[in-house]
């Protein structure tokens, strides 16, 4: 029963934070930002599927990302928490390595993209005189790019979608924060972020949480 209710609760609390909660008071804003992540963490904990090391690493990743949500008002501390969370995700995904030349080759476009966006951000930071952020930002872009590629290498649809959505979310956030304003950046960042974390939590399942009927084959996640 709990597993059936949690996705709806995650959706409701996530949309409430994005569209209803005001910027002030800040403590209320932070609490509502963390609440969907707490529910996603609970969802991952009660998920029946890859028990053991994979689930433990995903849970640790979710926890540090939730911590990052609360600390992001102190940017470097929040960024550090997210970086640690991604390291746990990377470890979990590489533990589910499922080699394919096609998936392996995605390292090239991901590397090109991460190099390009890193250069754009660094150029902007230099112009603004924020040299102290250059190394942390480069480290973070490198780690999240590796996380996205590691997710692709699992062959797990939920992990892949989650990893790519996370990259999209952080790309919008980085561009908006360091380079130029992005229209509707707030909703876009958080919608893709919560969706990414939910998909990563759902990757614990051994079977997909949905199926396609009426002439279409049910999707099977590659283990």
Outline where the language-model segments fall.
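Polytopic alpha-helical membrane-helix bundles and their juxtamembrane interface segments
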Residues: 1-223
């Amino acid at each position: 029963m709990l597993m059936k209710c949690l996705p709806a609760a995650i959706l409701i609390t996530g949309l409430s934070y994005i569209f209803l909660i005001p910027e002030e008071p800040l403590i209320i804003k932070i609490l509502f930002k963390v609440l969907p992540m707490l529910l996603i963490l609970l969802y991952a904990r009660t998920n029946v599927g890859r028990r053991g090391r994979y689930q433990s690493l995903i849970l640790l990743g979710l926890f540090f990302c939730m911590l990052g949500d609360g600390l992001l008002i102190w940017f470097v501390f929040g960024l550090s928490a997210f970086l640690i969370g991604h390291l746990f995700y990377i470890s979990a995904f590489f533990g589910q390595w499922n080699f394919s030349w096609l998936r392996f080759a995605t390292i090239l476009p991901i590397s090109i993209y991460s190099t390009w966006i890193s250069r754009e951000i660094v150029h902007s930071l230099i112009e603004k005189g924020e040299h102290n952020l250059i190394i942390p930002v480069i480290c973070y872009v490198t780690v999240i790019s590796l996380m996205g590629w590691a997710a692709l290498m699992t062959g797990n649809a939920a992990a892949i979608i989650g990893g790519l959505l996370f990259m999209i979310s952080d790309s919008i956030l980085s561009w908006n924060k360091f380079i130029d304003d992005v229209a509707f950046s707030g909703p876009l960042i958080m919608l893709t972020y919560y969706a990414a974390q939910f998909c990563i939590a759902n990757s614990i399942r051994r079977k997909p949480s949905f199926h396609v009927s009426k002439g279409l084959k049910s999707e099977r996640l590659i283990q």
